[in-house]
Amino acid sequence: MSRVCQVTGKRPVTGNNRSHARNATKRRFLPNLQTHRFWVESEKRFVKLRLTAKGMRIIDKKGIDTVLADIRARGENV
């Protein structure tokens, strides 16, 4: 499973580790992904999403039904 948020689309980005001597080595910055089950009242079932902490805040703000409609409009299966 790829490390991509289903709500925000955030994915890993690359950058550098920097030592005290300022030597650069490549590294990846990973999103804060969590797997979370949400109860969808309109469908009378749980939906499991893989999303970032920011994605959870978006669901708190907009509601699970609106966010699921956006995800399905993008063609993702949920």
From Swiss-Prot:
One of its GO terms (cellular component) is cytosolic large ribosomal subunit. Residues 1-20 are annotated as: Disordered. GO terms for biological process: translation. Keywords: Ribonucleoprotein, Ribosomal protein. GO terms for molecular function: structural constituent of ribosome. It comes from the Bacteria. Belongs to the bacterial ribosomal protein bL28 family. This is Large ribosomal subunit protein bL28. It comes from Vibrio parahaemolyticus serotype O3:K6 (strain RIMD 2210633). The gene is rpmB.
